[in-house]
């Protein structure tokens, strides 16, 4: 299964595509980030995210896309901007004819590290280890996107095993 993870951010929107082979080994197909200039108007940032995510999806052909659930932010303005980014990311996925799976941040950390309250650096280190990468992906949004994809792969594999036993 090939899964794309997206980590929505107002400075960088990270993406990563992870594939699980028939032995349940994970492979990073591509990872990167859409860099957003602080000087650009919001509508230009959103258009750039849309174009670049559509391009990655079309080029690498994931089966499903996973995105983190909305979390509560202290600053309402920041939360609203992230909501815009998340909406555009979901629109790009829908435009490419794929479905979106969403996961709570706690679920992503649990699936990758085994502990829902893991520190960001622990998640990043485990992503590098699980994908056999020479170093932790940068910026952090890229590692987060890969973690979201890994979460979906682990979750769907568990559900498949449960249904097979039923």
Swiss-Prot record:
Its main location: cytoplasm. The keyword Magnesium applies. It is found in: Cytoplasm. GO terms for cellular component: cytoplasm; Holliday junction resolvase complex. One of its GO terms (molecular function) is DNA binding. The keyword Transmembrane helix does not apply. Keywords: Cytoplasm, DNA damage, DNA recombination, DNA repair, DNA-binding, Endonuclease, Hydrolase, Magnesium, Metal-binding, Nuclease. Its cofactor is Mg(2+). Mg(2+) 1 binds at residues 7, 141. It catalyses: Endonucleolytic cleavage at a junction such as a reciprocal single-stranded crossover between two homologous DNA duplexes (Holliday junction). Gene3D superfamilies: Ribonuclease H-like superfamily/Ribonuclease H (3.30.420.10). Its EC number is 3.1.21.10. Mg(2+) 2 binds at residue 68. The active site is at residues 7, 68, 141. The RuvA-RuvB-RuvC complex processes Holliday junction (HJ) DNA during genetic recombination and DNA repair. Endonuclease that resolves HJ intermediates. Cleaves cruciform DNA by making single-stranded nicks across the HJ at symmetrical positions within the homologous arms, yielding a 5'-phosphate and a 3'-hydroxyl group; requires a central core of homology in the junction. The consensus cleavage sequence is 5'-(A/T)TT(C/G)-3'. Cleavage occurs on the 3'-side of the TT dinucleotide at the point of strand exchange. PANTHER family: CROSSOVER JUNCTION ENDODEOXYRIBONUCLEASE RUVC (PTHR30194:SF3). Belongs to the RuvC family. Homodimer which binds Holliday junction (HJ) DNA. The HJ becomes 2-fold symmetrical on binding to RuvC with unstacked arms; it has a different conformation from HJ DNA in complex with RuvA. In the full resolvosome a probable DNA-RuvA(4)-RuvB(12)-RuvC(2) complex forms which resolves the HJ. This is Crossover junction endodeoxyribonuclease RuvC. The gene is ruvC.
